[in-house]
């Protein structure tokens, strides 16, 4: 019995030491690479990376810093998804989107004033979608935007967060 207890306590000490070592490695990685230690790169289209909700504030400090403003392109906007990514096994992971500003004013090319009607519906696969109707000017501009961006994403942004950024498959 004493040997079993000794083995158990040694293993427990080893587990604790491993945890301390892992924590030290994580702290060193965060110190050496504060952004890359918190943001998992990848995603495709407009998504440049993923991060835990608990890391978004630290990432924001970096990506919205004065240094970042000097080195990142002036037409780049980095914005978080409105909701956690639903296609991941881990919960509370948000997508960071890279959006290109395409107007001289920095405003969206289309805004809410062109929407004449919007309602919740379900698509043919049973997934929830928002159906929108636009006025003539909005519909014309939307057709131009989708035609010019086939194969790329167009982000739907409200109050500074990305609600959707689907791939454009053709002019709409």
Please place each PLM-identified region on the residue numbering.
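Non-transmembrane, solvent-exposed regions of membrane trafficking/translocation machinery
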Residues: 1-168
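A short acidic/small-residue loop/turn micro-motif
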Residues: 170-172
